[in-house]
Amino acid sequence: MSAERSPARKPAAGVPAPAELGLLGDDLGYLLRRAQLAVFADFGETLAELQLRPGQFAVLTAIDHNPGVTQSDVCQLLGIQRPNFVAVIDDLEARGLARRTSSAADRRSNSLLLTAAGKRLLQRAVDLQREHESRLARRLGPGGRQTLLELLSRIANTE
């Protein structure tokens, strides 16, 4: 989007002119946030049938790939504030999807594991996540998903 404008049409009498974004239309942070909101809304709707939120999906995935991981390590891995994480893991534990055990290495911290029910739910969620990713890939066009992943990884410093 450039700063130049094409000639604007005058709105019909009594109809307000459409609002414009101005410099926000070229602002990376603004557009990343809008894209994140759109993607999370779709993913949230996708996971709703499992009564699972995107953040819970991320936590279950992290635990599944790192059995016995500590709460602190999951917080660091996913960028979750510890007070927020406690509520997430409390909910997952109450639903019988994850469990905490005292860490063998440091009894002051908890190790996290998925239960059998948690593994089953996560597999269903992964299937839905793949459908969600396919929808996004179609919107981005051939090669668009991979290009976007590479660019976002540069920004997020996760390469």
Model-predicted regions and their roles:
Residues M1-L50, R154:
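N-terminal leader segment of winged-helix/HTH proteins
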Residues S6, K10-P11, F40, G68, ...:
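Charged, amphipathic alpha-helical coiled-coil/dimerization segments
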Residues Q71:
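Helix-turn-helix DNA-binding elements, focusing on the entry/boundary residues of the two helices
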Residues Q81-N84:
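Helix-turn-helix DNA-binding motif, specifically the short coil turn and the N-cap/start of the second
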Residues C75:
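The alpha-helix within a helix-turn-helix
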Residues A62-N66, L151, T158:
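Short amphipathic alpha-helical elements of helix-turn-helix/winged-helix folds
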Residues D27, L31, A38, D42, ...:
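Pre-recognition alpha-helix immediately N-terminal to the DNA-recognition helix
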